[in-house]
Amino acid sequence: MDPAMQAPLRIAMVAGEASGDMLAALLIGGLQADWPGIELCGIGGPEMARRGFTPWWPSERLAVHGYSMQMLRRLRELLGIRRQLRRRLLAHRPALFIGIDAPDFNLGLEADLRAAGVKTVHFVCPSIWAWRAHRVGQIRRSADHVLCIFPFEPALLAQHGIAATYVGHPLAALIALQPDRAAARAQLGLRADDEVLAILPGSRASEIEYLARPFFQAAALLRQTRPALKLLVPAVLPLRERIVQAAQAAGMGEQVQIIAGQSHTVLAACDATLIASGTATLEAALFKRPMVIAYRMHPLNWSLMRRQQLQPWVGLPNILCREFVVPELLQDAATPQALCAATQHWLDARRQHPPTITALERRFTALHHSLQRNTPQLAADALRTILAH
């Protein structure tokens, strides 16, 4: 029997941020089904730990990325963690290393491990189709294989000599094709005829800093003509106080309902959402909800991103649909007045022109079907093939 197929199999993983923790947890489920007694270690979050993963460092230590000022300030710490992790992995070599997203941290580590003979897999293709196309060379050096969550990515990577497998998007399996709005509203204490706006200003402190206040200012403008509009804000505990402060600064402290977590319940219950660009926009699309996508950042970050942007869209629903199916308001365009007007369009359409909403829901349902696969099993199948060679 191939030694790599014998238990206990040892696999090292690195996941950054909550989204990486969720993706890795699904992957662990598939691995454990195929290899009982598998040993899993590295950098991970609470969902991974609940499934038997041994975290040497918590994933929140990596929770900065891109060209952010936070990353520049913390570069020494991140490089130190990566050096320690590399030494540990080379001293106690795993059968396989899997980097989950976090390309700024993982690709360099993967390259070093691969050069030393450790098989490497990168889960979630870096968005070379959106910006930073030069990164494709780094992916080719770093990963023996890439597990892709969007259907067009394997063919793109194949053009550059990179082996890849489409495993579907885990969120598409997690979210029902027909979300139960009535159940979600009942859970949140809402009436069937309530008009509900979900406000999601981001999952990182930097996003809250730039987006929360204009989002709440837009909500205040909406309430001037829609005084009964319900405003729901799902918030993870570490960001709750920042969100409360932003709401108070906009004079909306008593008018918004801040809910601990439950972003999926809020998206299922709402009529529309005002939302920060990121994975949450795909979640909103999978819940078939009209949205206004917005983003603001430090001017230096904005300048760097615009210089390397390859597509006219920023929001994932628009990128995947290849057109502006929902509006995007970015940087200086994301004013309270513009956010209010774009959101009002969707709220008015739901009550005054339902076919507009129906057409959007059909588009998002087709997108949902294209992303829905048995991700844990497909990923485990790909890893089995990699380990056997």
Curated annotation (Swiss-Prot):
The keyword S-adenosyl-L-methionine does not apply. GO terms for cellular component: membrane. Disulfide bonds: none annotated. Keywords: Glycosyltransferase, Lipid A biosynthesis, Lipid biosynthesis, Lipid metabolism, Transferase. It catalyses: a lipid X + a UDP-2-N,3-O-bis[(3R)-3-hydroxyacyl]-alpha-D-glucosamine = a lipid A disaccharide + UDP + H(+). Pfam families: LpxB. Transmembrane segments: none annotated. One of its GO terms (molecular function) is lipid-A-disaccharide synthase activity. Pathway: Bacterial outer membrane biogenesis; LPS lipid A biosynthesis. Its EC number is 2.4.1.182. One of its GO terms (biological process) is lipid A biosynthetic process. Condensation of UDP-2,3-diacylglucosamine and 2,3-diacylglucosamine-1-phosphate to form lipid A disaccharide, a precursor of lipid A, a phosphorylated glycolipid that anchors the lipopolysaccharide to the outer membrane of the cell. Belongs to the LpxB family. This is Lipid-A-disaccharide synthase. It comes from Verminephrobacter eiseniae (strain EF01-2). The lineage of its organism: Bacteria, Pseudomonadati, Pseudomonadota, Betaproteobacteria, Burkholderiales.
